[in-house]
Amino acid sequence: MARCGVASRRASEEIITSGRVTVNGASVTELGTKVSEKDCVCVDGKQIFIEEKKRYVLLNKPSGYVCSLSDEKGRAVASDLLKEAYTERLYNVGRLDMFSSGLIIFTNDGEFAARLSHPSAELEKEYIVDSSSPLP
């Protein structure tokens, strides 16, 4: 389900165990259930399909947006800036503070995101900071 852009792996597990998934019309609540390309998989009654095309988007995030897929406080979310141009679910790779601006990658390629963001990759990241106030 994560490869279909429905939700993250952890959220997909919750969706499955809560009984919101059907395979060929039968409810499925067991994690690890195998399906084939011929099976009809639905979440909340809507059929889902595997995302075949990998998408990589570089966004110049403006200040005032949260780097998250949703925000319980109702704040503006950076991924919303992409919704008009892209229909698939895109995830941010890393994050920037709400009040900072800068480049951030969004993708539907979970393996790519993990290679960039997991500490074991030991990738060096460089940040350039401009402050509107003098630093102490």
Where are these regions (language model features)?
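Basic, flexible Lys/Arg- and Gly-enriched helix-loop patches that mediate nucleic-acid binding at interfaces
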Residues: 2-136
